[in-house]
Amino acid sequence: DVVMTQTPASVSEPVGGTVTIKCQASQSIYSGLAWYQZKPGQPPKLLIYKASTLASGVSSRFKGSGSGTEFTLTISDLECADAATYFCZGSTYGGGYFGGGTEVVVKG
């Protein structure tokens, strides 16, 4: 199995700020990394797949980077609507493996 270590567990930044979330895989997953946004009572929303490809309709304020074992999600120009929990998912032929999540608090 692949262990996905996601940091930080929570982060608080003001509107207009920038948040960086890191995800480390216990073994190489090449570019098999996706990022999701989850809000209470709503299904997870795919933000980025293949490490850096923006999903349809997602703001370009969200940027994914990395390959192998080290990946990063950067959210720039934060908006109140970005307050949510963010998860990484590493995919291999053996299945999908999720990070522990990062709660993003946006201070208005």
From Swiss-Prot:
GO terms for biological process: adaptive immune response. Residues 35-49 are annotated as: Framework-2. One of its GO terms (cellular component) is immunoglobulin complex. This is Ig kappa chain V region BS-1. SUPFAM superfamilies: Immunoglobulin. Residues 57-88 are annotated as: Framework-3. Transmembrane segments: none annotated. Signal peptide: none annotated. Residues 1-23 are annotated as: Framework-1. Residues 24-34 are annotated as: Complementarity-determining-1. Keywords: Adaptive immunity, Disulfide bond, Immunity, Immunoglobulin. It holds the Pfam family V-set. Residues 89-97 are annotated as: Complementarity-determining-3. The keyword Disulfide bond applies. The keyword Disulfide bond applies. Residues 98-107 are annotated as: Framework-4. Disulfide bonds join C23-C88, C80-G108. Residues 50-56 are annotated as: Complementarity-determining-2.
